[in-house]
């Protein structure tokens, strides 16, 4: 600990029999204190975020923090603004973009693209988790919103099954297959077997169309009919089949097809 020692004033002459007291020392103690970094710049986004919170930053400044540095002859703020402009200045559209889109943007290499893709996926998973916790199964709109978050932006087809108890409480959500409905292995007997294992009273099935169109195909309708009949044999019910696009959904139940 740093200290400074100061000599006491000279003492008067004393008799040898009367020894002089030991000289006193005054110690100045400097307590440690927080100091700003020498190069702290409160006007920069990172410093303002730490001092005032993320709400103090613009969308472009938040994106700039993710990019870290500029590229393609631009500084980082110009790069962030250009990236947002590509998506109509919409953070949501940027987060909904397919992963490969980022690597085609000037100045964004694999490292920066990986950061953006990771943030996109973290955001998506957090929203899916939040939606699942709050999802009332007896609300078709809430179920469709959850499914759109979970599989709406996948670049390939995914088949999802929601297993429900007798009170329409959610038991489990499982992704049964990937690919396309004409090629992926969706076996009604396996879904029925899983329903029996989970003691499920009813099910909701869903799959996405990466093209964005939600009109069911003939194969979609055939699979729905076969599964509906197979579940009826074990006293379980197919409540709905939801086709999920990027921005819309189609409900077999709402259309009167179940």
Swiss-Prot record:
GO terms for biological process: proteolysis. Pfam families: RadC, UPF0758_N. PROSITE patterns: MPN, UPF0758. Residues 136-258 form the MPN domain. Disulfide bonds: none annotated. Keywords: Hydrolase, Metal-binding, Metalloprotease, Protease, Zinc. GO terms for molecular function: metal ion binding; metallopeptidase activity. NCBIfam families: PRK00024.1 (NF000642), radc (TIGR00608). This is UPF0758 protein Bcep1808_2579. It comes from Burkholderia vietnamiensis (strain G4 / LMG 22486).
